From Swiss-Prot:
Polar residues compositional bias, start-end: 531-543
Region span, Readthrough domain (RTD): 202-650
GO molecular function, one term: structural molecule activity
Note: This protein is translated as a fusion protein by episodic readthrough of the major coat protein termination codon. It is composed of the major capsid protein fused to a long C-terminal extension called the readthrough domain (RTD). Readthrough of the terminator codon TAG occurs between the codons for 200-Lys and 202-Val.
InterPro entries, sorted: Luteo_coat, PLrV_ORF5
Region of interest: Disordered: 1-25, 33-52, 201-239, 525-552, 606-626
Similarity section: Belongs to the luteoviruses readthrough protein family.
Stretches with biased composition (Basic residues): 37-48
Composition skew (Low complexity), residue ranges: 608-621
Protein name: Readthrough protein P3-RTD
Source organism of this protein record: Barley yellow dwarf virus (isolate PAV) (BYDV)
Keywords annotated in UniProt: Capsid protein, Host cell junction, Host periplasm, Membrane, RNA suppression of termination, Virion
Biased composition, class Pro residues, residue ranges: 208-236
GO CC, one annotated term: host cell periplasmic space
Amino acid sequence: MNSVGRRGPRRANQNGTRRRRRRTVRPVVVVQPNRAGPRRRNGRRKGRGGANFVFRPTGGTEVFVFSVDNLKANSSGAIKFGPSLSQCPALSDGILKSYHRYKITSIRVEFKSHASANTAGAIFIELDTACKQSALGSYINSFTISKTASKTFRSEAINGKEFQESTIDQFWMLYKANGTTTDTAGQFIITMSVSLMTAKXVDSSTPEPKPAPEPTPTPQPTPAPQPTPEPTPAPVPKRFFEYIGTPTGTISTRENTDSISVSKLGGQSMQYIENEKCETKVIDSFWSTNNNVSAQAAFVYPVPEGSYSVNISCEGFQSVDHIGGNEDGYWIGLIAYSNSSGDNWGVGNYKGCSFKNFLATNTWRPGHKDLKLTDCQFTDGQIVERDAVMSFHVEATGKDASFYLMAPKTMKTDKYNYVVSYGGYTNKRMEFGTISVTCDESDVEAERITRHAETPIRSKHILVSERYAEPLPTIVNQGLCDVKTPEQEQTLVDEDDRQTVSTESDIALLEYEAATAEIPDAEEDVLPSKEQLSSKPMDTSGNIIPKPKEPEVLGTYQGQNIYPEDVPPMARQKLREAANAPSTLLYERRTPKKSGNFLSRLVEANRSPTTPTAPSVSTTSNMTREQLREYTRIRNSSGITAAKAYKAQFQ
């Protein structure tokens, strides 16, 4: 029989030998990133490592969401992504202090609008990967203040390809709003993904040294009470104002086959709008140039001291109105423009202004060749309207700073006169067109260019030019006729060409002198010059002189034929009447019909009522028919001086 020993003591000894000592473990605090991946299903814990276990050096990816609040309609600033990101302490003061390297791989910037739908303006953002910019330099990325929107930037745009040291910023985001008020605009909500690498171990068993006790401060004398600081005044709001109006001038016209004259310009009433208030202001105007061919008006706009973006819209149409009587203000015609491509609206310095980025768009509308206005047609390139859109940046210095707006030339010859004809010169009111001048102190260049490009051009107008140009030279107001600009220093206006406002008696005297100059034997040269003839050849009675297809013989004198070019217009008409009338009429005395025209009465008073005017002997004597033809040919081709020299050979 086998015996079995006691197992109790043996079991006790075995338990004693198997008893393990407890090992003291120094706790180590290690920041562990979030684990991306599924959890274990069986719930078993991983085997423990050593006491100083460190997580995988590649780290992980964290997602941070933070906001930038209380953005105003005129706010600006910079958001620095990295250890300087004060808007997100979880990144700058938290996780970046636990890792050596990091990189931000993507960000999503959402602008959440808190503004009303009527709030105007936009907020622009720009990414600076060099971390050096102090102000916004690009206006490509923007959000409308009144709308919520978002933008996403990948690693290529934010320098997120490579890991950065956790002590330096990866990139900055600069922002700036272009509103003019301090109204609330909204907030930025920014979501970013951050990759981390090389964690730092923080040993919590090693106590940090206690700070040394500060020395007892030496008591300081009680300072004198300081005055209560005054509150910082609010910034001065940016100015935005506008001039709108239609300037006018007084002109004198007679028949539409005659030139016009202009009166001195003065103050022009313009509508002035600023801060939603409207009032009437008077600006100065004057003729910058004036001669017998054209006159050019300039309008002076005062500008407060500062820097402004200016946009000007001009719709040039020289409408003419009647003055006085029961029809005061009734439309009576127009003065057309020339078709010169360089005769456009322009801007220049009048006092204390400098310009840059001057952009001008010029258009015109010609008159149709079949249109007839006051018995005149638009068959020679006359322009009915001249419009322009101009924008530029102006720096105004001094309290009296101003710039001038130059209108296209007002043509004074009969070619551009489409006003109802009258027997004598009378004053009429001429408009220069509608002008709008807008000045904005906000100095947003991108908005100025956009405003210029979006200004509508009149439908079907012909584009003359659209380009950056130089402003006009500085001018001063020196009166009606004596203004000189630097471009006109070599062009002197003769005394005979200078225009003044004449009275009716002065005009009548000039008409009388011009008429008596055509009377035979009044002067040596009785033939009218080219300057005395208008575009439509007419005699002094107002009859159109027909152009003969073949040489017309008006009569004979001393055996020689008399041709139309050999006699003055008045004698030419008398000879035609004598040739067409019955022979008995040559000897009848007929009472001449009295004309109501003032000039005709003056001319007829100096004529003999019985004897008709005969051809000038000084023109036709001692010359054969062939010599007369040669005389006429020389006069038409070489001028009156050469013709006189030829005629002197036979006297």
